[in-house]
Curated annotation (Swiss-Prot):
EC number(s) recorded for this UniProt protein: 1.14.19.35
GO molecular function terms listed in the Swiss-Prot or TrEMBL record: sn-2 acyl-lipid omega-3 desaturase (ferredoxin) activity
Localisation: Plastid, Chloroplast inner membrane
Transit peptide: 1-65
Domain notes: The histidine box domains may contain the active site and/or be involved in metal ion binding.
Pfam families per the UniProt record, alphabetical: DUF3474, FA_desaturase
Biochemical pathway: Lipid metabolism; polyunsaturated fatty acid biosynthesis
EC class (word): oxidoreductase
Protein's UniProt name: sn-2 acyl-lipid omega-3 desaturase (ferredoxin), chloroplastic
UniProt organism field: Arabidopsis thaliana
PANTHER family: OMEGA-6 FATTY ACID DESATURASE, CHLOROPLASTIC
Position of sequence motif Histidine box-2: 199-203
Catalytic activity: a (7Z,10Z)-hexadecadienoyl-containing glycerolipid + 2 reduced [2Fe-2S]-[ferredoxin] + O2 + 2 H(+) = a (7Z,10Z,13Z)-hexadecatrienoyl-containing glycerolipid + 2 oxidized [2Fe-2S]-[ferredoxin] + 2 H2O; a (9Z,12Z)-octadecadienoyl-containing glycerolipid + 2 reduced [2Fe-2S]-[ferredoxin] + O2 + 2 H(+) = (9Z,12Z,15Z)-octadecatrienoyl-containing glycerolipid + 2 oxidized [2Fe-2S]-[ferredoxin] + 2 H2O
Family note: Belongs to the fatty acid desaturase type 1 family.
Length: 446
């Protein structure tokens, strides 16, 4: 009887030049050699084979011989090779330019709607007055702490809207921006034009060690000139979160001038009138607060305005600090030829503030805001999503927040303890820690 094998069409004879399988169908042996010699046929002793004596006297084995297919060896990369491939240098020049990011952002994200912007002002101002009226009416010590937190957060929201006026993202009308900006910022004791101009300097020089204006690093030389009380204030929580009013008066260590004085080196001669106007508005607001102290009493003013004002200051310092510090990876600061507007802007960070995102007008979408401050706040989330594919690893996805951004407190504390100064030399530098500031602190590896 001829050996039979299955074909696509049915059963066909197995050619005599091939030996029949010598193992059962559970075998993984595929040493299957052609032979022309009848001596290659041997009787199978497999219990699963079906032997029949052929006319030649040889036993045919019809066992199913299944073997694994031939596989190509897989060469795994060593952990070191994989690490080199995955390693990302945030200080390296990006493979894209500002125009690439701009092109990825939908055109409607650049459109400013003054009526929509004004609607946010009306909403926030109405909430501020409603909170004050409710707290004054209820006037008990269960309500007051809740009021302070809520009202301080709303003062901070007013600051963000005034901040949009300063950038021109509120509307295309400079006069409208100026009027609304003065009303909002003066109400929380911020000199609108003085701050607007210094904040413009911050955006134009973001990420530059010497030329940046807000929360920029101190060089080691300047750090070593600070007296102990200044160091303690600057690197101790919560004191550092109360820094903003002092910054307005005297700027940061290593810089001179004031946001209130028209002759400060912050300003150009042509900006003198603007600075005087804002300082006059600030003075008028301060005078109004003094009058209210005599009208309703200093204790009531402290409860209604004073404590919420300082909560607002803490929000401002908390948010602005974390937009430039505290990432788990060390981020570079630049000098000289290594600095560019794009590279400096890419060192900023987005943050998620949970329920507060909507209240403070999505200020946490900070990367795109820093690169393109003309985009209105109500388009920043969409613009950020559109830009992510271009930014790639240069965009650092923020940690998701719960209802309140409590996760950021640990990040803030860690950064305050570790980010003290940068080297006096070098065009790409990173923060270092002073091991003697608090005694023993863990210093980041360079």
């Amino acid at each position: 009887m001829a050996n039979l094998v299955l074909s696509e069409c049915g059963i066909r004879p197995l050619p005599r030049i091939y030996t029949t399988p010598r193992s059962n169908f559970l075998s993984n042996n595929n040493k299957f050699r052609p032979s022309l010699s009848s001596s290659s046929y041997k009787t199978s002793s497999s219990p699963l084979s079906f032997g029949l004596n052929s006319r030649d006297g040889f036993t045919r084995n019809w066992a199913l011989n299944v073997s694994t297919p031939l596989t190509t060896p897989i060469f795994e990369e060593s952990p070191l090779e994989e690490d080199n491939k995955q390693r990302f240098d945030p200080g390296a020049p990006p493979p894209f330019n500002l125009a690439d990011i701009r092109a990825a952002i939908p055109k409607h994200c650049w459109v400013k709607n003054p009526w929509k912007s004004l609607s946010y002002v009306v909403r926030d101002v109405a909430i501020v007055f409603a909170l004050a009226a409710g707290a004054a009416y209820l006037n008990n010590w269960i309500v007051w702490p809740l009021y302070w937190l809520a009202q301080g957060t709303m003062f901070w929201a007013l600051f963000v809207l005034g901040h949009d006026c300063g950038h021109g993202s509120f509307s295309n009308d400079p006069k409208l921006n100026s009027v609304v900006g003065h009303l909002l910022h003066s109400s929380i004791l911020v000199p609108y034009h003085g701050w607007r101009i210094s904040h413009r300097t911050h955006h134009q020089n973001h990420g530059h060690v010497e030329n940046d204006e807000s929360w920029h690093p101190m060089s080691e030389k300047i750090y070593n000139t600070l007296d102990k009380p200044t160091r303690f204030f600057r690197f101790t929580l919560p004191l550092v979160m109360l820094a903003y009013p002092f910054y307005l008066w005297a700027r940061s260590p290593g810089k001179k001038g004031s946001h209130y004085h028209p002759d400060s080196d912050l300003f150009l001669p042509k900006e003198r009138k603007d600075v005087l106007t804002s300082t006059a508005c600030w003075t008028a607001m301060a005078a109004l607060l003094v009058c209210l102290n005599f009208t309703i009493g200093p204790i009531q003013m402290l409860k209604l305005y004073g404590i919420p004002y300082w909560i607002n200051v803490m929000w401002l310092d908390f948010v602005t600090y974390l937009h430039h510090h505290g990432h788990e990876d060390k981020l570079p600061w630049y000098r000289g030829k290594e600095w560019s507007y794009l590279r400096g802007g890419l060192t900023t960070l987005d943050r998620d503030y949970g329920l507060i995102n909507n209240i403070h007008h999505d200020i946490g979408t900070h990367v795109i805001h820093h690169l393109f401050p003309q985009i209105p706040h109500y388009h920043l989330v969409e613009a950020t999503e559109a830009a992510k594919p271009v930014l790639g690893k240069y965009y650092r996805e923020p940690d998701k927040s719960g209802p309140l951004p409590l996760h950021l407190l640990e990040i803030l504390a860690k950064s305050i303890k570790e980010d003290h100064y940068v080297s006096d030399e070098g065009e790409v530098v990173y923060y270092k820690a002073d091991p003697n500031l608090y005694g023993e602190v863990k210093v980041r590896a360079d």
